Amino acid sequence: MKSPSAAVTEDNETAGVSSKAESPPASTEDLAAQKREARLRKFRELHLKTNEARKLNHQEVVEEDKRQKLPSNWEARKARLEWELKEEEKKRECAANGVDYERAKLLEISAEDAERWERKKKRKNPDLGFSDYAAAQLRQYQRLTKQIKPDMEEYEMEKQKQGEMFYPTSESLYHGTHIPSQSGIDRMVTDLEKQIEKREKYSRRRAYNDDADIDYINERNAKFNKKAERFYGKYTAEIKQNLERGTAV
């Protein structure tokens, strides 16, 4: 004999099965309508995305046209002006707070920026291109003096020997009385010989031929005569021969 609860469960299951059996399946037209609605929804989404992309492309084209009409160095000038505005703002803030601006600026510099600045400062004697002969001569002098390595042991010995006179003042008589050592003179002579050897190696001046005829008064005139001979020599060969023989009319 079944319990009342089991009977109720069987009745519920029977009712559910009968209800499922009674509900009619979805028709083919409803399925087609659902698919069509999904396609239309997707099409609308794609259409909205296309319109948005078109607007963004148009905005980018307008911005690119504006950038092309600006001066070539506009970006650099803009960045420079923005930096100057920030610097002025910081200066005003420091002045209002009673803080030294340079000190506050140093506190904001990172370790990487400080190292990069130090490396930049260590680049001595940079080649900035030719400006005048005096600057070129000064740069050469700095380069040559840098190549001569000092004798630090001799320097320390001389420093201990002279004492306070090693750092002369306006009242000192030590200036001009120093006599260089023989090793220092030898280093200077060696460096001068290297300079002469290097200068001779890179010299483009051609040696003169002692046996050749001299038909010039200076080097500039010699170059002009060679150029004239190259272009007109074949036309003036007979005239030169007559002049040399003394038979010219």
Swiss-Prot record:
The lineage of its organism: Eukaryota, Metazoa, Chordata, Craniata, Vertebrata. Keywords: Coiled coil, mRNA processing, mRNA splicing, Nucleus, Spliceosome. InterPro entries: mRNA_splic_SYF2. This is Pre-mRNA-splicing factor syf2. Residues 1-36 are annotated as: Disordered. It comes from the Eukaryota. Its main location: nucleus. It is found in: Nucleus. Residues 72-100 form a coiled coil. Involved in pre-mRNA splicing as component of the spliceosome. One of its GO terms (cellular component) is nucleus. Identified in the spliceosome C complex. GO terms for biological process: mRNA splicing, via spliceosome. The keyword Nucleus applies. Belongs to the SYF2 family.
